[in-house]
Amino acid sequence: ITYACTVNSDAAVVYGDSGNPNDVTLTWKRTNTEYYDTLTDDCHVYTYGIDLTKEFSDNNGNFDNVKFLLKNATDNYFVQAELNKSEGIYYVTGHTEKEADATKFSPMSGEVNHGKVMVKGLEDDSYIITEVATDAGYTLLKENITVDIVSSDSTTICSVCGKALKTASAKVNGKDVAMTEDNGSVSALVPLTITNTRGFDLPKTGGRG
């Protein structure tokens, strides 16, 4: 008997090292007995996010004109997500092989998460961020940005999920970055900043501090 589960991507999900418990109980009865057998198993499912900050060197750019694509480098698919405007967060909903059907991520331009592209619900894997549009007068990011997320349980089997796990880790363009917490769960988000100037683009890794 096998079973599968899907982790919804929304505010109820725990991102980072705390993980999401996935418990299953199987109860069955043999025809020649009067009692039931029960088997219980549990595992933790981990999911992560990207916290991208977009900046213009002169602070005059229009975030609404900026678009990014997010692609899974391992399986060669584009990420699809739905924006929760009140939270200023994109929650992953699926994926597609067609670029035309991919979500184009824009930085928030209101009071919530201003200048940020916050994407939650990513599995541990390698991703490619491509800037496909920017405000008039600014140059597109010339090179893609690679984000690698390594899960805290990548070497741990489900039956021993209860033991202490190593913290998740991340790299941006091959350089280690310190993942940030989310609602008390550490190693939840990969921070990076992209700054566009009118003459050239300067990607920066890591967060503020």
Region roles according to the model:
Residues 1-209:
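Solvent-exposed loop/turn and edge beta-strand elements of beta-rich ligand-binding domains
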